[in-house]
Amino acid sequence: MGIAISINALNKTFRGGRKALHDIHLDIKAGEMVALIGASGSGKSTLLRHMAGLMAGDGAGQGLIQIHGQTVQQNGRIAADIRRTRAGVGFVFQQFNLVDRLPVIVNVLAGTLHRVPLWRSLLRWFTPSEVARGVEALRRVGIAECCAQRASTLSGGQQQRAAIARAMVQGARVILADEPIASLDPESSRKVMDILARVNREDQCTVVVSLHQVNVAIKYCPRTVALHQGRVVYDGPSVALTPTLLRELYGADADDILALGDHITSLQDNKPVAPHLVWPAALAARAPLASAA
């Protein structure tokens, strides 16, 4: 299985000298479903935006990001052909990023715009086969009956499912989801995560999802990458994450991750690692604690 996302020596410093990402090295295999966890401000969203080429890293270092072998950015410069690379990357935002006044189907078919002529994209004119593909994507996420409604009439969970359908219509080989369930109720959260897991499994689509709920990472993602103050402090099997380990990794900041009420009840310090859920053995053999130096 090849590498879908490769990140080497990525650093990001914001104005004022605040270091957001510290020397990130990360390889994600094609077809993996990986969780990014961390307290607020740990760098999860910043890292995802760099993966998508929406932000550029520091130019002074040797930072390099590639998706399926295509360069997204290098040495602080976004690749000149980034549009071609982005065509295979779906980004699911926390705030849905739909156009409220447009019908759901039109929002979903925005995923085809990179493949259609400019005049058709300006007129929002789609072929019957494109519309059929959009309706099928909406059926797969369970909201086909809403295709003619304005996006503004959907609930938060339905809007997030429409955003995933847009990535499916796009034909994305990689989906980057930035806290897609942060503002949703538990039932809507479950449906959204079930859909992401199904797309990962059925379409062999690589999924990287940032989460604030550790138990959700354990349930859906065999592998978890934990960030703390812009550094990777854990990269390994999700099932190995216990409250004790999280406190070791995060110290006082662990309260931000553990203070989730019922969300954390599935975490037990003596919970055995289920072999069928373990992250691939060749990678799991690596020491789970990354250097924070």
UniProtKB/Swiss-Prot annotation:
Protein keywords: ATP-binding, Cell inner membrane, Cell membrane, Membrane, Nucleotide-binding, Phosphonate transport, Translocase, Transport
SUPFAM superfamilies associated with the record: P-loop containing nucleoside triphosphate hydrolases
Subcellular location, principal: membrane
InterPro entries associated with the record: AAA+_ATPase (IPR003593), ABC_transporter-like_ATP-bd (IPR003439), ABC_transporter-like_CS (IPR017871), ABC_transpr_PhnC (IPR012693), MetN_ABC_transporter-like (IPR050086), P-loop_NTPase (IPR027417)
One Pfam short name: ABC_tran
GO molecular function, one term: ABC-type phosphonate transporter activity
Annotated ranges, domain ABC transporter: 5-254
Alphabetical list of CDD domains matching this protein: ABC_PhnC_transporter (cd03256)
Reaction(s) this enzyme catalyzes, per UniProt: phosphonate(out) + ATP + H2O = phosphonate(in) + ADP + phosphate + H(+)
Annotated membrane topology: Peripheral membrane protein
PANTHER family: AMINO ACID IMPORT ATP-BINDING PROTEIN, PHOSPHONATES IMPORT ATP-BINDING PROTEIN PHNC
Function: Part of the ABC transporter complex PhnCDE involved in phosphonates import. Responsible for energy coupling to the transport system.
Family: Belongs to the ABC transporter superfamily. Phosphonates importer (TC 3.A.1.9.1) family.
Listed name of the protein: Phosphonates import ATP-binding protein PhnC 1
